[in-house]
Regions:
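Catalytic-core elements of nucleic-acid end-processing and repair enzymes
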Residues: 1-204
Length: 204
């Protein structure tokens, strides 16, 4: 599959857009564009979707920093014994599907993103296709706090100089015949919760 990166976007618009090259922790170089207007941002995102429209779906992720380009699922952040974490997680998921009546009707590929949506740590990454939602997450910092063995997530304004919106390309463009809202590719899977579940499951 051919993935097309956005190059020379600063030359495609009359706006004052700055492009810098950043080397990620993995050694790969990426372009980071400084964009100051929603109009330019919308054009930038649209261009990224356009040049990848044959084999990829481009979605968005708002972040307060780049984290060296690492997109690590919440289940594995700060962890080293990944096999052990995965085994415990698999057992927990199987127990939930078996014992929680509301969830028994849903396949695991749909249940996991739902739980991720409500703050449970899973191997999934949250992505959106709405620029305003991505901007909100880019402008707000999340903080976890544990009280009486319960973990709470608080959001507060990002005080950093820059906020980031990542364009994430997935090759999961083929809709599964037997699973509404589930798309599969060679390297990735994508679950659109708006199609996979009734709306009363989804928080604002």
């Amino acid at each position: 599959l051919m993935l097309y990166r956005i190059n020379n976007f600063e030359k495609k618009t009359p706006s004052d857009i700055v492009c810098e090259t950043t080397t990620l922790k993995c050694g790969q170089e990426v372009n980071v564009y400084t964009i100051e207007s929603v109009h330019d941002l919308t054009q930038f995102i649209g261009f990224g979707k356009y040049i990848n429209n044959k084999q990829h779906n481009v979605l968005l992720r708002g972040q307060t920093q780049l984290y060296d380009g690492a997109l690590i699922p919440s289940l594995y952040r700060g962890r080293t014994r990944l096999d052990s974490i995965t085994q415990k997680y698999d057992k927990k998921m199987n127990d939930i599907r078996k014992n929680v009546k509301s969830f028994t009707q849903y396949e695991r590929i749909i249940l996991e993103p739902l739980l991720q949506h409500y703050g449970i740590k899973t191997p999934f990454i949250d992505l959106v296709d709405n620029v305003w939602v991505a901007l909100w997450f880019a402008l707000h910092q999340a903080k976890c706090k544990t009280i009486n063995s319960h973990e709470y997530i608080y959001y507060y304004d990002n005080d950093r100089e820059y906020s980031y919106i990542l364009l994430v390309a997935t090759d999961a463009v083929t809709l599964c015949d037997d699973k509404s809202g589930v798309y599969e590719g060679v390297e990735t899977k994508l679950v659109d919760l708006r199609k996979a579940l009734p709306s009363y499951f989804l928080r604002p």
